[in-house]
C-alpha cells in the first residue's frame, strides 16, 4: 500500500536530533585528547551526558513512532535507521572515553580526518531526515553518504597501514586501540548507509 504523508512528525524531528547528537559527539571527541584535571573531568562529563541524551532521544523517537497514525516510511525502517545512528554515536563516545584513558597528548592526523568525515556524514543524515518524503533528494544525499564513507574507509586503511612506523610499542598500542574503536563506529555508520540504500531500492 502507498504510505501516507504527513506534513511533519515528531519521529522525524527526533531522527534529526539523533544525527545532531552524532555530530556533537565527533566535535567532543576531537577535543578530548590532552585534557587534564578539571578540563578532563568536564570532557568526560560531557561525553556521558551526550550518551544519555542520545539514548533519551531514541526512546522519544520510539514513543513518537508508536503513537504516529501514519509514517512516511514503514516503522521498522525508520527505527532501524534511527537506532543505527544512535549506535554510531555510542561508539564514537566510547572511542572518546578510550582516547581520554589512553592519555594521548593529541590525536593522530588520521584520527582527526576520520572524525571529520564522520561529522560530514552526520550532517548528511540530518538532511536525509528532512528528505524522507522526497526519494529523489534522499537518493542524492545517500550518494554523498557513500562517497564520504569510501573516503573514511581509505583514511582508516592508511592509518592502520602506517601504524608501527616510527612509533614506540606503547604509542603503537594506544593508537591501535583508538583506531579499532573508531573503526567500530564506522561499521555502525556503514550499516546505516546500507539500510538507507535498501529503503531507497524498495520504495522506488
Model regions and ranges:
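Cytosolic, long alpha-helical scaffolding segments
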Residues: 1-204
Amino acid at each position: 500500500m502507498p504510505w501516507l504523508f504527513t506534513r511533519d512528525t515528531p519521529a522525524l524531528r527526533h531522527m534529526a536530533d539523533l544525527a545532531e547528537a552524532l555530530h556533537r559527539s565527533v566535535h567532543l571527541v576531537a577535543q578530548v585528547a590532552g585534557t587534564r584535571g578539571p578540563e578532563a573531568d568536564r570532557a568526560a562529563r560531557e561525553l556521558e551526558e551526550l550518551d544519555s541524551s542520545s539514548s533519551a532521544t531514541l526512546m522519544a523517537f520510539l514513543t513518537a513512532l508508536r503513537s504516529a497514525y501514519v509514517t512516511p516510511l514503514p516503522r521498522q525502517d525508520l527505527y532501524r535507521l534511527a537506532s543505527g545512528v544512535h549506535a554510531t554515536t555510542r561508539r564514537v563516545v566510547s572511542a572518546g572515553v578510550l582516547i581520554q584513558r589512553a592519555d594521548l597528548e593529541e590525536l593522530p592526523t588520521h584520527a582527526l580526518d576520520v572524525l571529520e568525515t564522520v561529522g560530514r556524514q552526520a550532517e548528511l543524515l540530518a538532511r536525509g531526515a528532512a528528505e524522507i518524503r522526497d526519494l529523489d533528494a534522499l537518493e542524492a544525499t545517500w550518494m554523498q553518504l557513500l562517497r564520504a564513507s569510501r573516503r573514511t574507509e581509505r583514511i582508516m586503511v592508511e592509518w592502520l597501514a602506517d601504524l608501527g612506523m616510527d612509533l614506540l610499542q606503547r604509542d603503537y598500542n594506544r593508537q591501535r586501540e583508538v583506531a579499532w574503536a573508531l573503526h567500530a563506529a564506522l561499521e555502525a555508520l556503514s550499516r546505516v548507509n546500507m539500510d538507507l540504500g535498501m529503503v531507497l531500492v524498495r520504495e522506488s
